Amino acid sequence: MSYVVWDIETDSAQTDWATIIELGAILLDDNFKEKDRFSVRCRMPQDRVPSATALCINKSNVDLITKGNLSHYEMLVQVEKKFREWSPATFLGYSSINFDDEVLRKEFFKSLKKPYLTNTEGNSRHDALNIVKAAFAID
């Protein structure tokens, strides 16, 4: 089984309103050796206004998020293609189940793509935040 460690940057800190503007992922083998790397950024859709909180968290600015080469939809097509290419895998992130997965699902759904890509068709998901919480609870 392979592992995909991934993270997103968005224009909002709320899952209901967030739009992905950047995604980074690393494919690891069973021994946690890097096999592939993927990073993609898009320009923010013109109908969106980024939250100041998100810009601070992302260490970004309006120029950076409005001048990408890819449209938001083109970026999602590339993400879907890469995640399917890397499947089956366990998708890992930090706070990914409560934020990243939710935002990705909503973005895929709005773009008429399969929203549950990270936990169907042999894929599974896990959240490093839950591992940290469990370790803290045991200690």
Q: Each predicted region: which residue ranges?
A:
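Short alpha-helix plus adjacent loop in nuclease-associated cores
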Residues: G122-D139
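Substrate-recognition/cap helix-loop segment adjacent to the acidic, metal-dependent catalytic center
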Residues: F99-N123
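A short coil-to-beta-strand element that immediately follows conserved catalytic motifs
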Residues: E34-R37, T120-S124
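Amphipathic alpha-helical interaction segments
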Residues: W86, T90, S111-P115, D139
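Conserved non-catalytic scaffold segment of RNase H-like nuclease domains
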Residues: S2-E107
